[in-house]
Amino acid sequence: MTKILAVASEVFPLVKTGGLADVVGALPSALKHHGIEMRVMLPVYPAVAASLKQAKPIHHYDDLFGGKVRILAGQAHGLDFLAVEAPHLFDRPGNPYLGPDGKDWPVNWMRFAALSRAAADVGSGRIKAFVPDIVHVHDWQAALAAAYLNFAARPAAKVILTVHNIAFQGHFPASIFASLGLPVEAFAIGGVEYYGGVGFLKGGLQYADAITTVSPSYADEITTPEYGMGLDGLLRARRSVLTGIVNGVDTTVWNPASDDYLALPYVARNFVQRRQANKRAIEQRLGLEEHEGPLFCVVSRLTGQKGMDILVLCLDDLVGQGARLALLGSGEAQLESDFKAAASQYPGRIGVVTGYDEGLSHLLQGGADAILIPSRFEPCGLTQLYGLRYGCVPVVSRVGGLADTIVDANEAALDRESATGIQFAPVDASSLTRAIERATRLYADRKAWNSIQKAGMKTDVSWEKSAARYKQLYQKLLQNR
């Protein structure tokens, strides 16, 4: 059986700030059906410790980045874990990356270098309890493992790096390099050096045996200056080992037929009536008036990348068309303020909940008519996949994974009954306004709208196809050993 060590800074359901956690939490069970054993390595944050009380130590360091560290092996929520217990690094309040003040921990470089170093020690066979064939690292927080493994003294596992969002790169001052424990030759343009500093993601891209990102379109986009965030040149040079594989959805967690967060679960044959009960629950929760027009929802970080500043400019038109908006999200203070102001301006028509609420995110997908996703760039996106599964029609910008996963409701697609949503381009307020107008017109034609919903609900958004693609990639790497 092929053995994989997945390494990430967050894993659902133990700890989650975004879609990365969903992906890393769902992939092991999907791969198990393909005869692949995957264990997941993550840090022991306070939120994680309670779930790993039965874990047993398999390795220890007397001093790793300034303190004692243990690697624990255990199980939780059906997943097999190797957890890096380093109280001096990970036992602190806030989310995995930010302190209570909302700022990055100054020692984040040290925290995630420790995670990467531990992963490399497992991948090199130094820790005998689990010897993987491949170390599959996710994003900059785990990317430095590729550099450590490149310089390992013994034959090491192959390394795959998955980039979930190239905007987050882990760029730190050159002064930290001496503390990383890498040989001096690693601080070079062909190594971890990046614009005079240390780039964790850049080093991972340089040393990984294979690189994946989370959709074919995004794999193409990040090789261009517009989307590559300064790493496009390196990615063009490594294009032959770069693959785009669309994420899947954990269909046991996201299942409208058995979702406890819904007021009334439903299946394809009764979704029209039952989704109305969920819409009423949303209206009551957010103080929205009943109305014959469509109810749009947003479940998103409130940032410029997600196009939320563009949506703010469209709210007058949205309400003017007889539509309503239910928004769940948090992020930039100005955007939170803008949406709250809009809710005050249009009581009963716009409802806003700031923060994150897993249950409400499910209810919005299960009762809103459409979900707005106007991202400036979107590596894959999961909310549009949840929307497909729940019959909440995605209205998306034509970028990255959104372009790959949504079939636009143009005339030909509507005739074929293959349309699953609405795409728009370019990513600006006038295009989004026109997309909202299209959605509102289509919603008035209930036969056409129900056809779009049904086609979306029939779409296979599970991990099955994606897991098969990863299996092919793993096999290809191991053939070249």
Q: What do these predicted ranges mean?
A:
Residues 1-481:
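Catalytic cores of nucleotide-sugar-dependent glycosyltransferases that transfer UDP/GDP/TDP-activated
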